[in-house]
Design a protein with these regions (language model features):
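Ser/Thr-centric signal marking residues that sit
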Residues: 4, 33-36, 299
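Acidic-residue sensor for enzyme active/binding pockets
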Residues: 7, 42, 278
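Mobile "lid/hinge" segments at catalytic clefts and subdomain interfaces of large enzymes
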Residues: 15-16, 20-213
Length: 324
Protein backbone atom coordinates (compact mmCIF):
# COMPACT_ATOMS: atom_id res chain seq x y z
CA UNK A 1 0.00 0.00 0.00
CA UNK A 2 1.32 3.46 -0.96
CA UNK A 3 1.17 6.27 1.59
CA UNK A 4 -0.86 9.19 0.28
CA UNK A 5 0.13 12.85 0.56
CA UNK A 6 -2.88 13.37 2.83
CA UNK A 7 -1.70 10.63 5.20
CA UNK A 8 1.79 12.16 5.30
CA UNK A 9 0.36 15.61 6.12
CA UNK A 10 -1.87 14.08 8.79
CA UNK A 11 1.13 12.30 10.33
CA UNK A 12 3.17 15.52 10.35
CA UNK A 13 0.31 17.46 11.96
CA UNK A 14 -0.06 14.75 14.59
CA UNK A 15 3.68 14.84 15.31
CA UNK A 16 3.63 18.63 15.66
CA UNK A 17 0.64 18.41 18.01
CA UNK A 18 2.49 15.88 20.18
CA UNK A 19 5.59 18.10 20.28
CA UNK A 20 3.55 21.13 21.29
CA UNK A 21 1.52 19.22 23.87
CA UNK A 22 4.42 17.22 25.37
CA UNK A 23 7.55 19.18 24.43
CA UNK A 24 10.05 17.08 26.39
CA UNK A 25 10.58 13.86 28.31
CA UNK A 26 8.29 12.76 31.11
CA UNK A 27 4.57 12.29 31.59
CA UNK A 28 1.86 14.31 29.85
CA UNK A 29 1.57 17.73 31.48
CA UNK A 30 -2.10 17.68 32.43
CA UNK A 31 -3.64 16.30 35.59
CA UNK A 32 -3.97 12.89 34.00
CA UNK A 33 -3.27 9.57 35.71
CA UNK A 34 0.53 9.97 36.03
CA UNK A 35 0.44 13.42 37.62
CA UNK A 36 -2.60 12.51 39.71
CA UNK A 37 -0.80 9.56 41.28
CA UNK A 38 2.36 11.65 41.67
CA UNK A 39 0.35 14.07 43.83
CA UNK A 40 -1.08 11.07 45.67
CA UNK A 41 2.40 9.73 46.46
CA UNK A 42 3.38 13.03 48.04
CA UNK A 43 0.22 13.64 50.07
CA UNK A 44 0.29 10.04 51.33
CA UNK A 45 3.81 10.63 52.61
CA UNK A 46 5.45 8.15 50.24
CA UNK A 47 7.47 10.78 48.34
CA UNK A 48 9.67 13.60 49.59
CA UNK A 49 8.03 17.06 49.64
CA UNK A 50 8.17 18.77 46.21
CA UNK A 51 9.70 15.69 44.54
CA UNK A 52 6.57 14.45 42.78
CA UNK A 53 6.03 17.53 40.65
CA UNK A 54 9.42 18.46 39.24
CA UNK A 55 9.31 18.38 35.41
CA UNK A 56 11.46 15.63 33.90
CA UNK A 57 14.13 17.91 32.30
CA UNK A 58 14.68 20.02 35.46
CA UNK A 59 17.97 19.62 37.33
CA UNK A 60 15.93 19.45 40.54
CA UNK A 61 15.18 15.86 39.53
CA UNK A 62 18.80 14.90 40.21
CA UNK A 63 18.58 16.40 43.70
CA UNK A 64 15.33 14.61 44.51
CA UNK A 65 16.66 11.30 43.18
CA UNK A 66 19.77 11.59 45.35
CA UNK A 67 17.84 12.66 48.45
CA UNK A 68 15.27 9.90 47.90
CA UNK A 69 18.03 7.30 47.81
CA UNK A 70 19.48 8.61 51.07
CA UNK A 71 16.06 8.63 52.68
CA UNK A 72 15.36 5.05 51.62
CA UNK A 73 18.54 3.91 53.36
CA UNK A 74 17.53 5.83 56.48
CA UNK A 75 14.06 4.25 56.45
CA UNK A 76 15.56 0.78 56.07
CA UNK A 77 17.84 1.42 59.04
CA UNK A 78 14.87 2.54 61.13
CA UNK A 79 12.70 -0.36 59.85
CA UNK A 80 10.02 2.02 58.60
CA UNK A 81 8.09 0.40 55.75
CA UNK A 82 5.42 1.64 53.34
CA UNK A 83 2.75 -0.13 55.40
CA UNK A 84 3.77 2.01 58.37
CA UNK A 85 2.98 5.11 56.29
CA UNK A 86 -0.07 3.96 54.32
CA UNK A 87 -3.04 4.21 56.70
CA UNK A 88 -6.74 4.85 56.42
CA UNK A 89 -6.08 8.55 57.06
CA UNK A 90 -3.35 8.78 54.42
CA UNK A 91 -5.70 7.17 51.88
CA UNK A 92 -8.32 9.77 52.76
CA UNK A 93 -5.69 12.44 52.14
CA UNK A 94 -5.01 10.83 48.76
CA UNK A 95 -8.68 10.92 47.74
CA UNK A 96 -8.81 14.55 48.87
CA UNK A 97 -6.00 15.69 46.59
CA UNK A 98 -7.48 13.78 43.64
CA UNK A 99 -10.76 15.65 44.07
CA UNK A 100 -9.07 19.00 44.74
CA UNK A 101 -6.98 18.81 41.57
CA UNK A 102 -9.63 17.36 39.25
CA UNK A 103 -7.49 14.25 38.93
CA UNK A 104 -7.86 11.04 36.98
CA UNK A 105 -10.85 8.76 37.45
CA UNK A 106 -8.32 5.92 37.56
CA UNK A 107 -7.63 6.93 41.16
CA UNK A 108 -10.97 5.29 41.89
CA UNK A 109 -9.24 2.00 41.04
CA UNK A 110 -5.76 2.66 42.37
CA UNK A 111 -6.61 3.89 45.86
CA UNK A 112 -8.79 0.89 46.84
CA UNK A 113 -6.11 -1.37 45.30
CA UNK A 114 -3.38 0.22 47.44
CA UNK A 115 -5.63 -0.12 50.48
CA UNK A 116 -6.30 -3.79 49.71
CA UNK A 117 -2.57 -4.47 49.41
CA UNK A 118 -2.10 -3.00 52.89
CA UNK A 119 -5.07 -4.81 54.42
CA UNK A 120 -7.14 -1.64 54.81
CA UNK A 121 -10.84 -1.42 53.97
CA UNK A 122 -11.20 1.55 51.64
CA UNK A 123 -13.71 1.19 48.81
CA UNK A 124 -14.92 3.31 45.91
CA UNK A 125 -17.80 4.39 48.15
CA UNK A 126 -15.28 5.80 50.64
CA UNK A 127 -13.43 7.60 47.86
CA UNK A 128 -16.66 9.10 46.53
CA UNK A 129 -17.71 10.39 49.96
CA UNK A 130 -14.45 12.32 50.19
CA UNK A 131 -14.92 13.67 46.66
CA UNK A 132 -18.27 15.10 47.75
CA UNK A 133 -16.83 17.21 50.55
CA UNK A 134 -13.60 18.40 48.93
CA UNK A 135 -13.33 21.77 47.12
CA UNK A 136 -11.94 21.79 43.58
CA UNK A 137 -9.02 24.25 43.74
CA UNK A 138 -6.49 23.40 40.99
CA UNK A 139 -7.11 24.89 37.55
CA UNK A 140 -5.40 22.08 35.66
CA UNK A 141 -5.90 20.49 32.25
CA UNK A 142 -7.85 18.72 30.85
CA UNK A 143 -10.66 20.65 32.54
CA UNK A 144 -8.63 23.77 33.30
CA UNK A 145 -5.88 25.98 31.92
CA UNK A 146 -2.59 24.91 33.50
CA UNK A 147 -0.24 21.91 33.69
CA UNK A 148 2.04 20.22 36.24
CA UNK A 149 4.99 22.47 35.38
CA UNK A 150 2.87 25.47 36.38
CA UNK A 151 2.05 23.83 39.72
CA UNK A 152 5.73 23.22 40.42
CA UNK A 153 6.69 26.80 39.58
CA UNK A 154 3.80 28.14 41.68
CA UNK A 155 5.10 26.34 44.76
CA UNK A 156 4.66 22.64 44.11
CA UNK A 157 2.30 20.05 45.52
CA UNK A 158 2.98 21.25 49.11
CA UNK A 159 1.01 24.46 48.51
CA UNK A 160 -2.00 22.37 47.48
CA UNK A 161 -1.61 20.28 50.62
CA UNK A 162 -1.06 23.42 52.71
CA UNK A 163 -4.29 25.17 51.77
CA UNK A 164 -6.28 21.93 52.07
CA UNK A 165 -4.78 21.39 55.53
CA UNK A 166 -5.68 24.93 56.56
CA UNK A 167 -9.24 24.23 55.46
CA UNK A 168 -9.42 21.08 57.55
CA UNK A 169 -9.49 18.70 54.58
CA UNK A 170 -6.14 16.98 55.24
CA UNK A 171 -5.11 14.82 58.21
CA UNK A 172 -1.91 16.49 59.39
CA UNK A 173 -0.89 13.76 61.82
CA UNK A 174 0.00 11.20 59.12
CA UNK A 175 3.62 10.00 59.11
CA UNK A 176 5.74 10.53 55.97
CA UNK A 177 9.05 9.27 54.56
CA UNK A 178 10.80 12.30 56.05
CA UNK A 179 10.19 10.85 59.50
CA UNK A 180 7.93 13.81 60.21
CA UNK A 181 4.17 14.25 59.94
CA UNK A 182 2.37 16.06 57.14
CA UNK A 183 1.79 19.00 59.48
CA UNK A 184 5.46 19.18 60.41
CA UNK A 185 6.48 19.08 56.74
CA UNK A 186 4.14 22.01 56.05
CA UNK A 187 5.54 24.19 58.84
CA UNK A 188 7.59 26.44 56.54
CA UNK A 189 5.33 26.20 53.48
CA UNK A 190 3.55 29.43 52.62
CA UNK A 191 0.69 29.61 50.15
CA UNK A 192 1.75 31.63 47.11
CA UNK A 193 -0.85 34.33 46.50
CA UNK A 194 0.90 35.56 43.34
CA UNK A 195 -0.22 32.75 41.06
CA UNK A 196 -3.45 31.62 39.42
CA UNK A 197 -2.87 27.87 39.23
CA UNK A 198 -3.99 26.89 42.74
CA UNK A 199 -6.87 28.58 44.53
CA UNK A 200 -7.02 28.86 48.34
CA UNK A 201 -9.46 26.41 49.91
CA UNK A 202 -11.97 29.19 50.67
CA UNK A 203 -12.03 30.48 47.07
CA UNK A 204 -12.41 27.25 45.08
CA UNK A 205 -13.27 26.76 41.43
CA UNK A 206 -16.24 24.79 42.76
CA UNK A 207 -17.25 23.73 46.29
CA UNK A 208 -17.08 20.01 45.50
CA UNK A 209 -14.41 17.88 43.85
CA UNK A 210 -13.54 17.67 40.18
CA UNK A 211 -14.33 13.94 40.21
CA UNK A 212 -17.64 12.53 41.45
CA UNK A 213 -19.31 9.16 41.99
CA UNK A 214 -22.68 8.15 40.62
CA UNK A 215 -25.18 5.41 41.46
CA UNK A 216 -28.44 4.41 39.84
CA UNK A 217 -30.26 1.72 37.91
CA UNK A 218 -27.44 1.62 35.32
CA UNK A 219 -24.77 1.44 38.02
CA UNK A 220 -26.12 -0.19 41.20
CA UNK A 221 -22.60 -0.61 42.57
CA UNK A 222 -21.49 2.83 41.45
CA UNK A 223 -19.64 4.60 38.65
CA UNK A 224 -17.26 7.54 38.41
CA UNK A 225 -17.04 10.66 36.23
CA UNK A 226 -14.68 13.62 35.96
CA UNK A 227 -16.70 16.85 36.08
CA UNK A 228 -13.77 19.28 36.17
CA UNK A 229 -14.29 21.68 33.29
CA UNK A 230 -17.71 20.32 32.33
CA UNK A 231 -20.08 23.10 31.29
CA UNK A 232 -23.23 20.96 31.34
CA UNK A 233 -23.60 18.22 33.95
CA UNK A 234 -27.07 17.13 32.77
CA UNK A 235 -27.46 14.98 29.68
CA UNK A 236 -30.44 13.11 28.26
CA UNK A 237 -30.50 11.10 25.05
CA UNK A 238 -31.09 7.79 23.32
CA UNK A 239 -28.60 5.00 24.04
CA UNK A 240 -26.55 3.32 21.33
CA UNK A 241 -24.96 0.16 22.73
CA UNK A 242 -21.73 -1.60 21.75
CA UNK A 243 -20.25 -4.80 23.16
CA UNK A 244 -16.60 -3.76 22.69
CA UNK A 245 -14.62 -0.57 22.15
CA UNK A 246 -13.60 -1.49 18.60
CA UNK A 247 -17.24 -1.38 17.45
CA UNK A 248 -17.81 1.95 19.19
CA UNK A 249 -14.66 3.44 17.68
CA UNK A 250 -15.61 2.28 14.18
CA UNK A 251 -18.99 3.97 14.58
CA UNK A 252 -17.40 7.22 15.76
CA UNK A 253 -14.66 7.22 13.13
CA UNK A 254 -17.31 6.90 10.40
CA UNK A 255 -19.48 9.49 12.16
CA UNK A 256 -22.27 6.94 12.28
CA UNK A 257 -24.03 8.66 15.15
CA UNK A 258 -26.10 11.73 15.93
CA UNK A 259 -25.54 14.48 18.44
CA UNK A 260 -27.51 13.89 21.61
CA UNK A 261 -26.76 10.17 21.79
CA UNK A 262 -25.43 8.28 24.79
CA UNK A 263 -22.87 5.70 23.73
CA UNK A 264 -22.79 2.63 25.97
CA UNK A 265 -19.72 0.37 25.74
CA UNK A 266 -20.27 -2.93 27.56
CA UNK A 267 -18.09 -5.95 28.33
CA UNK A 268 -14.94 -3.86 28.86
CA UNK A 269 -14.67 -4.37 32.64
CA UNK A 270 -12.01 -6.40 34.48
CA UNK A 271 -13.57 -9.73 33.45
CA UNK A 272 -15.36 -8.71 30.28
CA UNK A 273 -12.41 -6.99 28.58
CA UNK A 274 -10.67 -8.74 30.07
CA UNK A 275 -8.41 -6.30 31.86
CA UNK A 276 -10.50 -3.10 31.98
CA UNK A 277 -8.53 -1.22 29.34
CA UNK A 278 -8.93 2.49 28.69
CA UNK A 279 -11.60 3.60 26.21
CA UNK A 280 -9.02 6.03 24.87
CA UNK A 281 -9.59 5.67 21.13
CA UNK A 282 -13.31 6.39 21.29
CA UNK A 283 -13.09 9.34 23.69
CA UNK A 284 -10.20 10.85 21.73
CA UNK A 285 -12.15 10.49 18.48
CA UNK A 286 -15.22 12.19 19.98
CA UNK A 287 -13.06 15.00 21.31
CA UNK A 288 -11.31 15.36 17.96
CA UNK A 289 -14.69 15.70 16.24
CA UNK A 290 -15.58 18.43 18.77
CA UNK A 291 -18.67 16.64 20.05
CA UNK A 292 -17.46 16.12 23.62
CA UNK A 293 -20.37 18.14 24.98
CA UNK A 294 -22.92 16.77 22.52
CA UNK A 295 -22.40 13.03 22.99
CA UNK A 296 -22.14 11.18 26.32
CA UNK A 297 -20.37 7.89 26.96
CA UNK A 298 -21.02 5.23 29.60
CA UNK A 299 -18.88 2.13 30.09
CA UNK A 300 -17.89 -0.58 32.54
CA UNK A 301 -14.36 0.01 31.30
CA UNK A 302 -12.14 2.90 32.30
CA UNK A 303 -10.75 6.08 30.78
CA UNK A 304 -7.48 7.85 30.23
CA UNK A 305 -6.89 10.58 32.79
CA UNK A 306 -6.95 13.01 29.87
CA UNK A 307 -10.52 12.19 28.86
CA UNK A 308 -12.77 15.19 28.29
CA UNK A 309 -16.53 15.49 28.03
CA UNK A 310 -19.30 13.62 29.82
CA UNK A 311 -17.75 10.17 30.18
CA UNK A 312 -19.01 7.85 32.92
CA UNK A 313 -16.77 4.87 33.64
CA UNK A 314 -16.17 2.01 36.08
CA UNK A 315 -19.87 1.09 35.97
CA UNK A 316 -20.54 -1.74 38.38
CA UNK A 317 -21.48 -4.51 38.28
CA UNK A 318 -19.81 -4.95 34.91
CA UNK A 319 -21.76 -6.52 32.04
CA UNK A 320 -19.75 -9.75 32.17
CA UNK A 321 -21.04 -10.47 35.68
CA UNK A 322 -24.65 -9.64 34.92
CA UNK A 323 -24.60 -5.87 35.32
CA UNK A 324 -27.13 -3.66 33.50
Amino acid sequence: KHTTAYEIRLSLVGSEMCIRDSPSAGACGGQFTANTMACVSEVMGLALPYSSGAPAPYEDRDKYAYESGKQIMDLIEKNIRPRDIVTRKSLENAATIVAATGGSTNAGLHLPAIAHECGIKFSLDDVVEIFKRTPYIADLKPGGQYVAKDVYEAGGVPIIIKTLFEGGYIHGDCMTVTGKTIEENLKDVEFNENQKVIRPYNKPLSPTGGVVGLKGNLAPDGAIVKVAGLVNTFFEGYARCFDCEEDAFECVSKKGYENGEVKVIRYEGPKGGPGMREMLSTTAALSGQDVGGKVALITDGRFSGGTRGLCVGHVGPEAATGGP
